[in-house]
Amino acid sequence: VVFSYSGSPEAAERLAAETGSTAVQADSADRDGVISLVRDSGPLDVLVVNAGIALFGDALEQDSDAIDRLFRINIHSPYHASVEAARRMPEGGRIIVIGSVNGDRMPVPGMAAYALSKSALQGLARGLARDFGPRGITVNVVQPGPIDTDANPENGPMKELMHNFMAIKRHGRPEEVAGMVAWLAGPEASFVTGAMHTIDGAFGA
């Protein structure tokens, strides 16, 4: 198992030691770096793309360079990583991209670019599923809603606003998302491809 990280090298190395995996620092905005990372990882059975950033603010006032960086990380990186991984995958490989329920629903202002980037992943999965299907390689998107992480803690300032949109009024847990990813990576999901798998407590319902 190889995973990449951007910051927090100490946390990455701890995780690598605990799991017997290899941590590689990488910039997901760097196309050539993303391609090299996948290429240098050797033969791949499963690729999980989990890099992403968000921007908040009025679209009329946002910095164009920041928007371009968001698109490089949230759209270009998953595309190039997926294509490069497919070159190295055996028949029956798995590509799983972590998107967001905001690809389906954006109920608040100030996140147009983020929502666009997550909607783009839906087209990526549908298109690459057609391209890679003859080799039995599946391509799916997991679309979490609010998940209790350092980036979006349940006790954060957005809790009440987000929970008002949800049927299950709590943040999801990382292990719930991981369970969906593990199922998609397994043999039971060999006929599941080009699909969006939303895990959001009905945030998008």
Give the role of each language-model region.
Residues R88, R170-I199, F203-G204:
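C-terminal substrate-recognition "lid" of short-chain dehydrogenase/reductases
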Residues D58-A59, D63-F71, M162:
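Substrate-binding pocket helix/loop in short-chain dehydrogenase/reductase
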Residues Q25-S36, S64, E175:
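The beta1-alpha1 cofactor-binding region of Rossmann-like NAD(H)/NADP(H)-dependent oxidoreductases
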Residues R87, R130-P134, S190:
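Alpha-helical segment proximal to the catalytic Tyr-Lys
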Residues S82, S117, A125:
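Active-site helix of classical SDR
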Residues V1-A12:
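Conserved glycine-rich Rossmann-like NAD(P)H-binding loop of the short-chain dehydrogenase/reductase
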Residues Q62, M106-A115, G127:
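Active-site loop-to-helix junction immediately N-terminal to the catalytic Tyr of the SDR YXXXK motif
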